[in-house]
Amino acid sequence: MPPAVPAAAATARQSASGRERNFKDKDKPESVRNSNIVAAKAVADAVRTSLGPRGMDKMIQSGNGDVTITNDGATILNQMSVIHPTAKMLVELSKAQDIEAGDGTTTVVVMAGALLDAAQNLLSKGIHPTTISESFQSAAAEAEKILDEMSSPVDLSNDALLNKMATTSLNSKVVSQHSWLLAPMAVNAVKKIINSENDSNVNLKMIKIIKKMGDTVEESELIEGALIDQKTMGRGAPTRIEKAKIGLIQFQISPPKTDMENQVIITDYAQMDRALKEERQYLLEICKQIKAAGCNVLLIQKSILRDAVNELALHFLAKMKIMCIKDIEREDIEFYSRILGCRPVASVDHFNADALGYADLVEEIPTGGDGKVIKVTGVQNPGHAVSILLRGSNKLVLEEADRSIHDALCVIRCLVKKKALLPGGGAPEMEIAVKLRNLAQTQHGATQYCWRAFADALELIPYTLAENAGLSPIHTVTELRNNHANGNSSYGVNVRKGYVTDMVEEDVVQPLLVTASAIKQASECVRSILKIDDIVMAVR
C-alpha cells in the first residue's frame, strides 16, 4: 500500500499540470488577439493627428539622414519602421487605399483603429470574434448602400465642380496655399488624357511629372507636349529645332560588342588604323541612315550593356544638325511614343520617315543652376498624354508638392471611375453612424451590439477633424449628430469657421469612391485581424 501513495500524488500533479496547460492554451488566443489590436491601434494613433486640413505634419528621418516632412498617411506609414506583423497590415491597408483611390490613406487607417477599439470592447463583453467579424461585414455593406443614397451624380464637363474636389484634397497638404494653381492643373491634365464620355479609368502614367528645384511652386506649369529630363548631347549640337522630326530608337549608336568574350589581338599600327576606320565607318553609316530618314531630333533609350551613343557618333550627329537626347528610361518609352506620335525602332534597318513624330518646336530650356530640360511643343497628332513641370524652392517642398498633386490627380481619377460625390467634413461617416444605429434595432442578439459599435467607431472621423482643428470634439460631434438625426445629411465639421455647416454650400466635397473604399478596406482589414488567434514562427 505505501508505494501507491506517491503514485497517486504523481497522477494528481500530472492532471493538475494538464489542466493548467489547457487553461493556458485557452487563454493564448485572447492574449494574441489583444496584442494584435494594441499594435495596430498604435499605428493608427500615430497618424490620427495628421487627419484633416488642420492636421499636423510629421518629420521622418531615414537612416542615411534624409528628412521628409509630410502629412500624407501613405508616405508616413511607408517610411515608418514597423516591426509587429499586425501593425504591418495597417501599412499594407494604407497602400491598398492609395492604389484603389489615391486619397483617404490617413482616414482608412484611423477608421481601422477605431473599429479595432470597438472590437476590443465587444470581445471584453464575451462576444465571439467570428460574430463580430460577420457583423462588421454586414454593417460595412449597409454603409456602402447609405453612401450611394446620399451621393450626388457628377458631370465631368463641370470644371468648376472638379476644381472644388481637387481643392478639397489639397487643403490638408503642406502646399495648400497653392491649391488655386495645382487643382486646375490636375483637372486639366486628367481631362486631356481621357474621353469623358466613354472612359471609366485614368492611366496616370500618361501624365509625366518632372520635378526641378528652383523658383516656387507657383512657377509650375502644365505643358501640352513633352518634357524630357535630359540635356542635349554633343559639343556644337543644336539646342533648338523648329519643325522637328522626332525619332525614338532602342538600339545603340556605338561600336558593337561580340556576344562572347573574345579577344582581338592587334600587332601593328596598320591593323589598329583599320580597326578604327571600320568603327568610324560603322557609326557614320548609322548616322547617315538616320539623317536620310529626315530625322533632326533623336531620342535614344538608355542601355546597360554599352554606351547608348559614343563621342564619335555625337560628333557626326552634331555635324548633321541632329539634336541628340540619350538615356531615355525604358519605362518612359511608351509615354514618349504616345505623346510625340513616333514609333520606337529597335533596328537601324527599320528606321524610316514613317517612324517619326512631328512637332513645331523642340528646345532646351534652363530650370535654374545647371538644370535643363527639353521641351517639345506643337506636337502634330499627339496622343492622350501631358507633362507637368513642378517647381519648388527646396527638396522638401518639391517632394510634398509632388505627393499633393498626385493625390489631386487621384481624386479626379476617382470621379472618372465612379461618377458621384459626397459632402466632406466627416458628413458621410456621421450619416452612416446615425442610420446604422437606427438599423441596429432591426438586428437580433449580439449583431445589434456590433452594429452599434461599428456606428460609434465611425464617429471618430468627425471627432478627430474637430480635435485637430482645436474645436471641442464632444460638443462638435454632438451638434453634428443632432443635425444628421434631423435629416441634414450634408452637414459636416467646418474647420475654417469653427462650427458645423452644410459642406456642399461650403464647396467641401469628395469622391464617393474614396469614402466607400476606405470603409470597405478598413472593415476587411479588421476582420482579418480578429480572425487571428496565434502567431507561429515559420522555419527559415
Swiss-Prot record:
Positions of region (Disordered): 1-32
Any one Gene Ontology BP term: post-embryonic body morphogenesis
Compositionally biased residues, Low complexity: 1-12
Pfam families: Cpn60_TCP1 (PF00118)
Primary site of residence: cytoplasm
Domain of life: Eukaryota
GO molecular function, one term: unfolded protein binding
Disulfide bridges in this chain: none
Bias kind Basic and acidic residues: ranges: 18-31
Keywords attached to this entry: ATP-binding, Chaperone, Cytoplasm, Nucleotide-binding
Subcellular localization, as worded in the UniProt entry: Cytoplasm
Gene Ontology cellular component annotations, sorted alphabetically: chaperonin-containing T-complex
SUPFAM superfamilies listed in its UniProt record: GroEL apical domain-like, GroEL equatorial domain-like, GroEL-intermediate domain like
PROSITE patterns: TCP1_1, TCP1_2, TCP1_3
Subunit structure: Heterooligomeric complex of about 850 to 900 kDa that forms two stacked rings, 12 to 16 nm in diameter.
Function in brief: Molecular chaperone; assists the folding of proteins upon ATP hydrolysis. Known to play a role, in vitro, in the folding of actin and tubulin.
Family: Belongs to the TCP-1 chaperonin family.
Protein name: T-complex protein 1 subunit delta
Native species: Caenorhabditis elegans
